[in-house]
Amino acid sequence: MDRDLEQALDRAENIIEIAQQRPPRRRYSPRAGKTLQEKLYDIYVEECGKEPEDPQELRSNVNLLEKLVRRESLPCLLVNLYPGNQGYSVMLQREDGSFAETIRLPYEERALLDYLDAEELPPALGDVLDKASVNIFHSGCVIVEVRDYRQSSNMQPPGYQSRHILLRPTMQTLAHDVKMMTRDGQKWSQEDKLQLESQLILATAEPLCLDPSVAVACTANRLLYNKQKMNTDPMKRCLQRYSWPSVKPQQEQSDCPPPPELRVSTSGQKEERKVGQPCELNIAKAGSCVDTWKGRPCDLAVPSEVDVEKLAKGYQSVTAADPQLPVWPAQEVEDPFGFALEAGCQAWDTKPSIMQSFNDPLLCGKIRPRKKARQKSQKSPWQPFPDDHSACLRPGSETDAGRAVSQAQESVQSKVKGPGKMSHSSSGPASVSQLSSWKTPEQPDPVWVQSSVSGKGEKHPPPRTQLPSSSGKISSGNSFPPQQAGSPLKPAAPAAAASAAPSHSQKPSVPLIQASRPCPAAQPPTKFIKIAPAIQLRTGSTGLKAINVEGPVQGAQALGSSFKPVQAPGSGAPAPAGISGSDLQSSGGPLPDARPGAVQASSPAPLQFFLNTPEGLRPLTLLQVPQGSAVLTGPQQQSHQLVSLQQLQQPTAAHPPQPGPQGSALGLSTQGQAFPAQQLLKVNPTRARSGLQPQPQPAVLSLLGSAQVPQQGVQLPSVLRQQQPQPQPPKLQLQPQWQPKPRQEQPQSQQQQPQHIQLQTQQLRVLQQPQHIQLQTQQLRVLQQPVFLATGAVQIVQPHPGVQVGSQLVDQRKEGKPTPPAP
């Protein structure tokens, strides 16, 4: 196909070259006259015969229409192009040869000019040309003479450049002619009109070439290209840039004067204006210049009263009810304790959270320092996630909250011998016993302690424990399986525990206590804490106890129980087994041979103690321990000791012993100290305050814990005490974790529910004070609050004297990240 097209193009070039050099002569019929096209062809043949052989010379076979008009004096249509904004005009020739102007148009109306460029007869001129006195049609075409006065306007007389254009009819003009011819008053049918139109087309159309060769089309395209090569759209745009419609707006803008606001005054005009204006220049002396605003008199009357409410502007604080913020279930927490602050004392409000992970029975805690609370704060409730298994937390001096709690333990209780660490966790681990509300039972099930003796291999499957909530509904808790709750503990020598005692410059750390936090979905007013220490012994003996307490107790009466004095190893009596804090390695271990027991007592309200000395408020750590008496060590040691009391036998026990969940052994080893006499706490529940009488022996507090201070003692009424003789109690270190509890009133009907074993935690606000302060006197503040408390103790085997066993805490204070306990 490409080859045929190339051959057709070559043939078209040859045809054009032959036609330009030697066009053939035509033969016409002698009867008919020649048409306009035939006349033009004859002139072309004549001019080609005169063509010189030298191609460099000029050709004469051009401008054929001008030569035809000069030869035959054919009438034509005259179009004048005037310079400037004069526009153009159309003139018709009269019979005497003069021209009369018919139409004058500006250059902006380019419709007629576009028809002239296309060499087409405009349909709008049909009526004008038909009414002309001279027939200007030649074979249906019109010859137009264009006189251009724009380039020779400066000549006198003005000259012009002339060229002729042949306007050929189009289908529009033929339709217009048919319409004009049928207006003669006769009736023309549609067929007659179509026949007339066909005759006009045949008469005015050029001869057709019906040769199927492609060379014919290529020849016609080449001739049209040579004729319209300078009449392209880009060339038209370039020429219109210098046409009058484009130049006229520019000239009009240059001729118009600018508006007065935009006129620029010259420098001479400015100087002329300044000539008549006097200039007053006053230069003041140095030091005598006074500002204008200072020189003005200012007499302001001081108002006697000011309405602050009208002048003050209040800003609405963003609340949880704002639709733009996500609405979270908020829980209002307020400080139930009324501390009096002194000058220079920095108040710290800590809200510890005690919880237990799934992979380890050792308790996890999180202590966060809060800002100074001047008003009630709203806080979103803590939501546990069952998939979160965080490692246990260890209190330490890395944060202010841990340091405040450590100083509170140091100033009130004995000094720590084996310090432990606490690392803060950003995510709250899930509670082991997630409480959910169920139907209220008639008699709630009690909770019992399960223990096993090392070496015998006796294990019991942990039963499902149900704890009654304060609202009267049952909450179920899942205990640990035996393989997760117990792990072997490494014994340690007493010398290693004694060498681990920190100096006075070191800050003691807070021990851990095992607890479980309830699920926030149920939101019971009472928080549930579980203490389940497990001790593994090499040699079996009597007197050692493991404490496992959980469950609520309803009542309003404080309980107290006595204990037998513990003698130091040097006094001849067998020393109790110590548990070293440095040996606390894992969070759980198998329990020794322990006999479970349950103690139920009625307590109307818990007792909350606060310490106030003449020097000011001193930090005091409140603990809630089992119902057995608990004694802390003397002032010369820095370790916390918890002495488990003898098993209490309560005649009103209504439930038999059942196997309970295993716990972990918690505690730090300390040296035994003799307690020759028993001291009782004297409490008046009806009063808001009661004095403490300083005594030279340590104090015993059975319900909420024991806080021993050098040279001090407190005493309980004998009516509230329950005594049970035992050979010798062991020494266990208490590791407390604190958990906030909201104050809620309980109805009297709920206070008569059966009692269960439970340890209640309270929110403590600690004041940061120096560590080494000798406390001589204490003032005890007792607050009554309807909560649920219970304690319990069971007797286990006491180890051989001189043997210390325990679990070692692997995490050290210098480590930045806590090591998760072994499962």
UniProtKB/Swiss-Prot annotation:
Residues 469-509, 568-582, 636-650 have a biased composition (Low complexity). GO terms for molecular function: transcription coregulator activity. It holds the Pfam family Spt20_SEP. GO terms for cellular component: SAGA complex. Residues 246-273, 369-524, 560-601, 631-669, 720-757 are annotated as: Disordered. Residues 423-440 have a biased composition (Polar residues). GO terms for biological process: regulation of transcription by RNA polymerase II. Belongs to the SPT20 family. This is Transcription factor SPT20 homolog-like 1. It comes from Homo sapiens (Human). The gene is SUPT20HL1.
